[in-house]
């Protein structure tokens, strides 16, 4: 179904008359960025064409967004480019660092200087790494006229190291999506600490220089945030926090796509593309249009959104899970609830509260919350972890889990895994890796309480 949607979008782009030109843009340090410029064949209006720049994700290339460029090119000139260190571009990848921000400014200025382009009507669309670049460049003063971001971060540190424990598996995957020879020394300098949750002050400083949240309250530019329902790298909380801060026209779409365990494009790609084109048409051309402030796509996607005037209302479901377990090394505790009496859908960050007696250098507690339905496979609802380095003795731990929207069928039993890594739940669950701890490390876990924020009315079936 997704493939059919992409074919339809590409066909729509081919049916519209535009030209396509391959380019090489020279940066001020001598590095060349490979780019493609799509332009309508029609003559520009007196003030010039409004235009859009597309930014791809980490480890990607500009061709990943060909389907989107063609969908937009019937209405706008569209510039796609290989980010520094990616695809056919030169240079090294510093993951939206200062050098990449200089590149973004140069790309904007290059496009704005073209006689057929209206420099006051240039928009930006970015996914993941590209979304981070769009938001960071926006708060650094690049005068985008309208912005769209997809499955990205507003605060990179809180995304990758919530509660001072890095999502080591996600960090490993991201860093290995780019050949080591193409990583900038600034990334290599924090790589080992980012994997091991050590020297977190340096990791935070590095991440803060690539984040936008602290400055979003001054942004009045129209911003449309598209975030995935089940994205364990950059969760709904990243967009939710940014959405609340923005002062200009803003919209939030929580869709059926994302980083693992989801994919992009997802089954609602036609909806995402249609709304994206409508947003740019509204704020770059001025065509009147209305948008729901907040939209939530059901999973599986059935072609219809649930819309809200504000962020959806939720209530709390609290579940007590008794038991006591003593763990060493790769041991795990497993607690199971009774069956749920109704279908529920999470929306927000669940919490796990548990008493822990720590000794011998036990440095982390990871919680994986799953649902075991009456029929079908076990489903990971959410997961998270807390850094316990330096703690000894008895402590009441509160573990915040990832903010995702997950449908839990009626009759499901909740299963809570507590361990030192997410692999204790499944060998395929690589979000928190099983990193070494001292042989003397021990933890004794007491009863646990799970607090689930759930929608007052589920949107999925």
Spans of features found by a protein language model:
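Short beta-strand/loop motif that positions the catalytic acidic residue
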Residues: 219, 225-227
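Short substrate-entry loop that stabilizes the transition state in hydrolases
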Residues: 44-49, 54-90, 232-235
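Catalytic histidine neighborhood in serine/cysteine hydrolases
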Residues: 246-261
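Accessory cap/linker subdomain of secreted extracellular hydrolases
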Residues: 125-127, 135-218, 287-291
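Gly/Ser-rich "nucleophile elbow"/oxyanion-hole loop immediately N-terminal to the catalytic nucleophile
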Residues: 41-48, 92-100, 106-128
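Proline/glycine-enriched tight loop/beta-turn segments at coil->beta junctions
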Residues: 31-33, 41-51, 218-220
């Amino acid at each position: 179904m997704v493939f059919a949607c992409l074919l339809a979008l590409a066909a729509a782009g081919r049916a519209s008359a535009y030209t396509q030109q391959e380019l090489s843009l020279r940066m001020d340090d001598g590095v060349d960025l490979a780019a493609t410029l799509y332009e309508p064949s029609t003559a520009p209006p007196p003030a010039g064409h409004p235009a859009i720049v597309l930014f791809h994700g980490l480890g990607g290339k500009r061709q990943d967004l060909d389907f989107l460029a063609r969908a937009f090119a019937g209405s706008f000139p569209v510039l796609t480019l290989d980010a520094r260190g990616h695809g056919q571009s030169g240079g090294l990848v510093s993951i939206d660092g200062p050098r990449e921000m200089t590149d973004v400014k140069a790309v904007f200025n290059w496009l704005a200087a073209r006689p057929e382009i209206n420099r006051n009507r240039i928009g930006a669309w970015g996914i993941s790494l590209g979304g981070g670049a769009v938001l960071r460049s926006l708060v650094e003063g690049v005068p985008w006229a309208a912005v769209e971001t997809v499955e990205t971060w507003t605060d990179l540190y809180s995304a990758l190291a919530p509660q001072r424990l890095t999502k080591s598996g996600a960090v490993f995957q991201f860093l290995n999506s780019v050949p080591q020879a193409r990583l900038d020394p600034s990334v290599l300098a924090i790589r080992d600490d980012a994997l091991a949750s050590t020297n977190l002050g340096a990791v935070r400083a590095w991440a803060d220089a690539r984040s936008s949240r602290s400055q979003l309250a001054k942004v009045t530019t129209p911003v449309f945030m598209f975030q995935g329902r089940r994205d364990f790298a950059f969760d709904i909380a990243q967009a939710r926090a940014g959405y609340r801060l923005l002062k200009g026209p803003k919209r939030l779409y929580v869709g059926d796509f994302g980083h693992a365990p989801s994919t992009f494009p997802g089954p609602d790609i036609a909806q995402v593309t249609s709304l994206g084109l409508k947003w740019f048409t509204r704020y770059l051309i001025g065509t009147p249009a209305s948008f729901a402030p907040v939209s939530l796509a059901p999973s599986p996607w059935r072609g219809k959104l649930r819309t809200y005037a504000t962020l959806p209302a939720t209530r709390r479901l609290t579940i007590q899970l008794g038991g006591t377990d003593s763990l060493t090394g790769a041991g795990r505790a497993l607690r199971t609830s009774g069956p749920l009496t109704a279908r529920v859908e999470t929306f927000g960050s669940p919490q796990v509260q548990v008493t822990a007696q720590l000794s011998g250098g036990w440095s982390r507690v990871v919680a994986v919350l799953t649902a075991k339905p009456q029929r079908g496979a076990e489903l990971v609802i959410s997961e998270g972890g807390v850094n316990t380095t330096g703690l000894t003795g008895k402590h009441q731990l509160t573990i915040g889990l990832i903010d995702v929207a997950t449908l839990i069928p009626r009759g499901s039993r909740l299963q809570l895994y507590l361990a030192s890594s997410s692999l204790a739940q499944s060998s395929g669950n690589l979000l928190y890796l099983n990193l070494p701890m001292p042989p003397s490390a021990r933890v004794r876990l007491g009863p646990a309480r799970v607090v689930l924020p759930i929608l007052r009315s589920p949107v999925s079936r």
